[in-house]
Amino acid sequence: MVFADGFNSLASGIGAGLLVRDHKVWYACIPHLWQLHDKDRDGKAESRQSLHYGYGVHVGYLGHDLHGLCLGPDGKLYFSIGDRGLSVETPDIRIDHPDSGAILRCNLDGSNLELYATGLRNPQELAFDNYGNLFTVDNNSDSGDQARLVHVVEGGDSGWRIGYQFINNPQPRGPWNSEKLWHPHFPGQAAYIVPPLANISNGPSGLSFYPGTGLDDRFNNHFFLCDFRGSAAISGIHSFAVTPSGASFKISDFQPFIWNILATDIDFGTAGEIYVSDWVQGWAKPAKGRIYRIYDPTARNNDKVREAHQILAGSLSEYPTDALGKLLQHSDRRVRQESQFELVTRNQSSLPLLLEIAIKGNDLLARIHAIWGLGQIAQQEVIPSILDPLQTLITDRNDEIRAQIARVMGDSQYGQGVDSLKKLLQDPSNRVRFFAANSLGKLKPDHAIEDLFTLIRENDNRDPYLRHAGVMGLVGTADVKSLLGAGKDPSSALRLAIVLTLRKKKDPAVSHFLNDPDPAVVLEAARAIYDTPISESLPQLASIITRHDLP
């Protein structure tokens, strides 16, 4: 049965992303992001709506299209575009980003579209972990560089530009290779990028996070990555985990999971099984394909798997509110997330339960889902004061609770949380400080500038993710005058962060730092002027070519 067709205009790309929810299908097919609706539930879409138009603004490699549709913990739709770029206009915003791949997010109706992260080449799939962290594995450019495991953070730039693909001299791929932009973090690396966590795989395609039921417990908190190398003999699926490292993570337990299959995608069914799509063989279109269903007979038959299947196959709208609260601690993340979303639809009637779980609950994941749900309600109802009782949690004993509170305060525009966020900038956990700085950037209090300066000085460029969060904080809180006022600060780490902030603001005042005593700061200012570009500052950049004290 054909659910919908006709996606074959001259501009149409590969249909490369699907998300199904409540008899609606979100379908990614350049140049549109579509929403299809099967109103009478007969297996055919009666209506279709283009939520956005303008993805894929130029010719690029086959498959560098629109894909990766998934739901975030905030109830928003996240998706990716390869380096064919975009120029999209909605009633809310116009986004022009033609020269790299990107991650975007929006509400399920397409509103409030945001450019979430940039500088990617072709991030095929996105996956959230149990704590709301977003990851992708981005493809290499076949010139000695390697694919990258990317912790996707808001405002992050991974460094790729499509023009690099066509540079052969003096070095293939230009700055991508010569400046080692695809390498994990090392001292002296370009500071405007958020570096990858690791170089893994050769042809990353499908990526999925284990939901918590169906496999042996050793796979808890693991990702599964399809590695497409053109031949089944050398292709397959890896599993790996990430462990906390500063404000971000490091990779661990990287192992082959299923091998000798030209897998393109992997997903988890609701009854404990895994579904894997198989290209069969070769790089050319083979005109055939297979889908395998794989399962562990012992794990598949346990009570938690059967319970998760029953819940996900039914309707949570029929569950009492208290029962939904208990499901927030279920071992299957999909059950927890759907229970959270159902509680959100019940709006303020579910507030007492969510607050009780968030503040007094004993299960960490249930508390986190309750915090996310409260954040959703605060945003949807435009009543940030819903979060007032959560202020007590900034001193919670658990780092993750403090981090999620900081995160939700910014996302919900909770202005009363500014003082709490300033305190969290001094938290012993870099992850907590990361979210506090990022949220201050969203709330824009100018009296937080000095606190952010202190954070950046203390970090002293050691943690690039924390530096990025400090920059995002300054982008929202600091005007150019305040930034230039600290232009002679003894901390070169702070001066570097100011350059990065001015780069994001695309402000010609960045040229002031072409005379900085630290060559690393000068280099970053030069990159900002040339790469962005900031045309007004190009003459000042050209004038330093005669300086002999620069590398």
How should these model regions be labeled?
Residues I93, Y116, N139, I193-A198, ...:
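Hydrophobic alpha-helical scaffolding
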Residues D267-G272, S317-E318, L328-R346, W372-Q379, ...:
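C-terminal substrate/ligand-recognition segments
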Residues S317-K326, N347-I359, Q379-T395, Q413-Q426, ...:
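Amphipathic alpha-helical scaffolding segments comprising HEAT/armadillo-like alpha-solenoid repeats
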